[in-house]
Curated annotation (Swiss-Prot):
Organism: Nostoc sp. (strain HG1)
Residues covered by region (PEP C-terminal anchor): 240-263
GO CC terms in record: cell outer membrane
Signal peptide as annotated in the record: 1-24
Short name of any one Pfam family annotated for the protein: Ice_binding
Family from the record: Belongs to the ice-binding protein family.
Designated name of the protein: Ice-binding protein
Amino acid sequence: MLKINRKYAIILAIVAFSSFQTEAKAASISMLGTASNFGVLGGSTVTNTGPSVITESLGVSTGSSATGFPPAIVNGTIFTSDTVAAQAQVDNATAYNKLASLIPNKDLTGLDLGGLTLTPGVYSFSSSAQLTGILTLDNLGDPNALFVFQIGSTLTTASNSSIVTTNGDAPNVFFQIGSSATLGTGTQFMGNILALTSITLTTGVNIDCGRALAQNGAVTMDTNKVSNACYTKPQEKAVVPEPDSSLAVLGSGLVSLLFAFRKRFRKGW
């Protein structure tokens, strides 16, 4: 009976882990509609310099110009001034307005995001927002944790700034920006940028677990990587809680569990 229970425990852990990842990704897709299929979406144009990589599709609407591809690589499809890109912009605008309508939990106006550790919620800036250093997002073990940053005007990050997570990945991070975003050189960004005007990714900026979506203006790139794939780097992982804290932690310990029982599977139960 113990041997059977061990088998079931591993199977349940796999199912639970897969389910949590699917639900979290579905929540992000639901918010963005067809815009979720794009890594970069520009309103007037998308321009690139250097060997950038976009792991999803690239779109431009209502403009029609996407330059610098190649040398940049787009693993998805390039859509310019067509019905696919137009619908993505409609969905982008819908998501932008929905995010803007949410009631904030906390006003961060005047604070630098760098050095803060934030839990899921809606955070607002009446005007501009700045990130200098490291912003930590604590998911509290919730795979569907939602972080929304409502920014009245601009978002600017200093060189080599970063966003990291603890207690899980963060597929549902949204920056709703009233005008434009400029990410400083070497910034390691995480989350979806929905800017009313433009987005500038300077040299060496990477966006993980997110997208660069500009409604009316340009997206400007320079040797960047943009991917909606989510992951937690080893040094950013939190200590796994005791087993009785939540079913969600089964996913966190899945790899260790599989290694522990690998030899037993080979020998038979």
